């Protein structure tokens, strides 16, 4: 009977997928992409901490993540309060582990470890206890540090700085990584550019005005992230308002220098610059503005010269091209911890948890 069931299911799935394609081409492409990431997350289940249990979007996302079997979840908070909120919202979080810092037997060990880690900064046991009992972000990061969880997703009601501060203090950077940076995974519907509309935009979330060395590091990390998540070869363009010397300015010089450093450090990477955006992604423009470049017109990883450009760039794609923008996704932290945009939906949280799980798998 299982054969009948599975083929029925396949027919149903096929019919519904055809329906989606006909009614909403855009949602089919995007769902297709995030569905692949979800399936990869399910292939080796990871434990992800969600510390923002006071936010209904977190609880709604938890319900969806557990129903779909994307990850094991740890929710940080007072058990009674979390369960009450979930019940009020009609969300089933029975499959999640709820950890209350005030009653968990692990808390004392976390306090001791935090004091040890922050000793040079003069942290006392009283201060550590105060932080861990009241700031669930810190508690979540300590769970990851101590191996009680694989990764964390937060930021629905905290700023990027608040989310990343405990990570940098406690988890530090990944071995061999000079810089923590952030990228957005951008999926543009009906788009012939990039990898069928998939791009990584970096740094669009963290580093304000990177110098050439930092820009080169962002390029290398972003290429690695693209390969991990999109599973295609990265083609990296260093963006500017100039293409191959068409404009002269100190800002252009920075990108030229960064391109040189990135090429020296990553000789096997398809990387070039400096490019205007059209020269980077449109084949005909790339061919005329930068003939002979292996990257011009083919880029799928776009490295912006500073945070202004990167942030404006991803929001333009999101709002005008109706792209899905997942992120800011961090790269370079010793363990995967990801930020959310404060305007995120529950589905955005589900997507970022799946992405975080895939990043955790890559560390195995």
What are these regions (language model features)?
Residues 13-15, 25:
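Short hydrophobic alpha-helical segments enriched in small aliphatic residues
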Residues 10, 29-30:
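Residue-level detector of intrinsically disordered terminal segments
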Residues 6, 15-17:
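Compositionally biased, low-complexity intrinsically disordered regions
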Residues 1-6, 24:
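Short, small-residue-biased leader/transition segments that mark boundaries at the very start
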